[in-house]
Amino acid sequence: MPTSAAVQTDDSLASPFDWPGRPHAAPGFARLGERFLTRLPPVPMPAAPYLVGFSPEAAAPLGLSRAGLDTPAGLDVFVGNAIAAWSDPLATVYSGHQFGVWAGQLGDGRALLLAELQTADGPCEVQLKGAGLTPYSRMGDGRAVLRSSIREFLCSEAMAGLGIPTTRALCVIGADAPVRRETIETAAVVTRLAPSFVRFGHFEHFAANEKLPELRALADFVIDRFYPACRAEPQPYLALLREVGRRTAALIAQWQAVGFCHGVMNTDNMSILGLTLDYGPFGFLDGFDANHICNHSDTGGRYAYAQQPQIAYWNLFCLAQALLPLCGSDPTAFTDLSDEAQAQPAIDAAQEALLVYRDTYGEAFYARYRAKLGLTQAHDGDEALFGDLFKLLHTQRADYTLFFRHLADVRRDDTPAQAQARTVRDVFFDRDSADAWLAAYRQRLQTEPAPDAARAEAMRRVNPKYVLRNHLAEIAIRRAGEKDFSEVENLRAVLARPFDDHPGFEHYAGPAPDWAASLEVSCSS
């Protein structure tokens, strides 16, 4: 693996920073070569760095402690002021569709991949987001701001706590350097971790530029590293497409089940590993609105909550188009897409491979919601029960998280007085309509074999008490702006175990206050 000297003109950025037991660094994506990336150093911060947030859960596989990172040498490496000997910083090139329109070449415009570390859990890429200009920055300045970095840090770890596949966030480091957005904001760098940051857009880039050897090399890299079972298939690239479709479907079902809205599901923000990637204008549902748009920049509602399953399929279709040259009858040869006799079989095969998304999503969606309702068996009337529930929640804008959390308290043999006293009714303004659905739900529970207590316990393991509501993130951001990082840490710790009770932090579980309705998040991070 090339050392950091390969990207420096002098030794001014060299750092001895290391920690005992650091996993071995080895070439991963970097082995693909210069057609896929550009090696360059980070741009040093013009102000002193300070630690804003640290995730011990994300750091555990790396063997890195907060005390080990929070040193002058450690802060310098993870803010981009210095390059450790185990690091080989680089930015990758990709393209993509943004809001349904081909955007051409994109790439890591403010992110640098520092290294791939071989942990006991497998490969772990370490990436700085906000590390300065790269050849792919386009009109950007290469920086990230404290506001968006805290949001990404907290949500990455919150999603991990929920058991949803995601990139992780090791730390956030701030620096009192001005960054111009809609206003002047404070600079920050978030360190992200993932087995790989390869996106759908990486494949689109080489397909669009007709660089077919590079397209094959990228697909082979992903298969050999992350989908080795595909190599044994007669059509390994079609097998890859199917497996990515399966993982993506499972991921989106998990998003929908917890009320997570990504906000900007462009193809360049879709992980080839089925991870939640790029936390920008995201949000969790407060009052349930199937058409909720969390991204203020999404004026057409393309990425609204209810649209996410279809958008994920659309993005997979773009990935399939990119892989078509590899999907012909002979996987060792490139398919000539200008020749209908070659192209049509590849198209048909890719379309068939994508069917796995529809089937997997449907199965995963209903399995998730049966679990949320405490139902262990599938019944013919369940879809109608679910549909009536979604209509009820949507019509009354009932708090999504609180409803499912309180639903565990319902008992199948509640007396009328007990039914009237259940807290779950409090999330509705029209309680008569809620009572009608709850009566149907109690009737459905009569067919379940599990006792009420066991069912309630199981429901509390899948229905979180805590999610990262926008107003909670906003409070943490405002306090961090005053150099009080305690709210970032408290929120991180609670969200790492969102299904548990946390005495002293019950206010994190409450509904959004009225002032939160004015909060807006957009792509301007």
From Swiss-Prot:
Residues at the catalytic site: D268 (proton acceptor)
Catalytic activity field: L-seryl-[protein] + ATP = 3-O-(5'-adenylyl)-L-seryl-[protein] + diphosphate; L-threonyl-[protein] + ATP = 3-O-(5'-adenylyl)-L-threonyl-[protein] + diphosphate; L-tyrosyl-[protein] + ATP = O-(5'-adenylyl)-L-tyrosyl-[protein] + diphosphate; L-histidyl-[protein] + UTP = N(tele)-(5'-uridylyl)-L-histidyl-[protein] + diphosphate
Keywords: ATP-binding, Magnesium, Manganese, Metal-binding, Nucleotide-binding, Nucleotidyltransferase, Transferase
GO molecular function term, any single one: AMPylase activity
Residues that, per the record, bind ATP: G107, G109, R110, K129, D141, G142, R192, R199, D278
Keyword Manganese: yes
Binding positions (Mg(2+)): N269, D278
EC number annotated for this UniProt entry: 2.7.7.-, 2.7.7.108
Cofactor(s) the protein requires to work: Mg(2+); Mn(2+)
InterPro entries attached to this UniProt entry: SelO (IPR003846)
Function: Nucleotidyltransferase involved in the post-translational modification of proteins. It can catalyze the addition of adenosine monophosphate (AMP) or uridine monophosphate (UMP) to a protein, resulting in modifications known as AMPylation and UMPylation.
Family: Belongs to the SELO family.
NCBIfam families: PRK00029.1 (NF000658)
Listed name of the protein: Protein nucleotidyltransferase YdiU
Gene: ydiU
